[in-house]
């Protein structure tokens, strides 16, 4: 039998090393995918910048599993005036929505203004997810529709809130919809930011605004 030459032995060693490196890289990639899947909502949502004491809020919405808190501002006109517009604001990710109220009040002084902090944001209880945020937003809309039965309702959404607002627009058909710095879908945003990960397989909360808005019949501003 022929003895292996030094060059063939070296090639075998290099090949084995490459196999080990490929296996290690594959394991690291799978570990990264697993971590992304398990921790994505902690990465995606940023409530830590929005915390506020409950006694600094003046509006709340009781949900089956959480108490949500926020703010309401009303004009000096009669609360029951059916011509007074109602404006619902859904804030951006990491936005302290209480600071949006003075700006909205200045821009829309003759409107009823409402906003809630998302679950886990501000003084609201619970953990954020797309399903939870959308369900909460629909519940808020229903409460306001019952409170202001004949008033026109405008829904405003900024950034993350544009995804929530699009879901409300699809299912509740508000009179007007205003989207500020919107995105087409969270999936496409994630694909752009993390092109090396199979985000279409991993992402739980997709906020597919383009698809949802196809069902909205009102004006989009």
What are these regions (language model features)?
Residues 157-161, 165:
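Gly/Ala-rich beta-loop-alpha elbow adjacent to hydrolase catalytic centers
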Residues 167-175:
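Conserved hydrolase catalytic core segment
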Residues 17, 21-62:
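An N-terminal hydrophobic leader/cap segment in hydrolases
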